[in-house]
Amino acid sequence: RGLGDVYKRQELIDYYFAQAPSRSCERTFANVYLWSRQYKVKYAILHNALVFRDEGDGHTYAYPVGKPEAVKAALEELMKICEEEGCEFGLYCVTPENFSQMEEWYPGQFQIEYDRDQADYIYETEKLATLAGKKLHGKRNHINKFKQLYPEWSYESLSDENVEACFQMALKWRNSNGCNDDPETVSYTHLTLP
């Protein structure tokens, strides 16, 4: 039941993400890593399934990642942990496919709630790469303004040397955009017992 810190385990986490491809930002190492301090995210491997726990919000877990039999075993372990510790069992990052699978395993036992505020924006690669068309005009303007304001910008791979700077940049962005004042920032799509 030991929970590990996310950083330094990218290879392991990416291995599990590759087993269950998803378009969710919650299923990318960069996103999990950058938000791991804010939400106190820890991970564990339970029954050969990857599980994330948001320690800042009680016992809330991301839907496990792995092969179906491993996911079911991990879910049962998580439910047991919550029962032993006397807390409500809740999941986030539950896709319609995940919920269908749970309905198969546990008919009528769970309900799902959609939280629009936590939905991902999904763009087609080509449209985002070219930013062509009227719909993406605003994004083109933002990028052009950024390039004017920061002519020395560059891309960098995440490394030991720049990891703290990345966290500080993300925290600075959150502070300047009022995210710390928003009580809803820890809200997710939850799956709970009815």
Can you say where each PLM-predicted feature lies in the sequence?
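Ligand/cofactor-recognition surfaces for anionic moieties
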Residues: I13
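Short acidic (Asp/Glu) patches
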Residues: A74-E76, E104-Q109
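Conserved donor-binding loop and adjoining core beta-sheet/short helix segment
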Residues: E26-E97
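Acyltransferase donor/substrate-recognition loop-hinge adjacent to the catalytic core
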Residues: P107-N180
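Conserved small/polar residues in nucleotide/adenosyl-binding loops
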Residues: G2-Q10, T189-P194
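Hydrophobic, Leu/Ile/Phe/Ala-enriched alpha-helical segments that form helix-helix packing faces
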Residues: F17-A20, L78-G86, Y150, A170-R174
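Short, glycine/charge-rich beta-strand/loop segments that flank catalytic centers
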Residues: E88-W105, R116-D120
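A conserved beta-strand-loop-helix scaffold within acyl/acetyltransferase catalytic domains
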Residues: A20-Y39, W153-L191
